[in-house]
């Protein structure tokens, strides 16, 4: 099986690297809140899961903003290809942030 790199692989890789540098706090907080939820007793779990979801939504929105800003500079048709590649790259790197990115 031959794997082909996407047309936008390099630029998306750089964008995600910058996101990781600029928003490492969001990535770390999501991991910490998920761990807290997983350790929680039943009576605390619902609130802690809500906290986790809030951080994931923040990260997802930040990533969608990056995606949409760049896609806006591309010709019609090409922008959709870029968006699909971007969403797949996010899913490979941070599954939690990818769950809702297509809906943003």
Report each predicted region and the residues it spans.
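General helical secondary-structure elements
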Residues: 1, 63, 88-89
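Short terminal alpha-helical segments
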Residues: 1-38
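Generic alpha-helical secondary structure signal
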Residues: 6, 10, 43-46, 50, ...
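Generic detector of leucine side chains in alpha-helical contexts
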Residues: 16-21, 34, 48, 62-63, ...
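Amphipathic alpha-helical interaction modules
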Residues: 23-67
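Amphipathic alpha-helical binding modules
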Residues: 71-104
């Amino acid at each position: 099986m031959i794997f082909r790199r996407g047309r936008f692989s390099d630029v998306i890789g750089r964008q995600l690297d910058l996101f990781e540098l600029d928003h490492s706090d969001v990535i770390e907080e999501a991991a910490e809140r998920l761990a807290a939820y997983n350790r929680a007793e039943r009576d605390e779990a619902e609130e802690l899961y809500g906290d986790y979801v809030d951080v994931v939504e923040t990260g997802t929105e930040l990533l969608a903003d990056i995606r949409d800003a760049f896609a806006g500079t591309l010709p019609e048709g090409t922008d959709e290809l870029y968006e699909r590649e971007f969403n797949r790259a996010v899913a490979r790197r941070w599954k939690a942030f990818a769950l809702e990115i297509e809906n943003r």
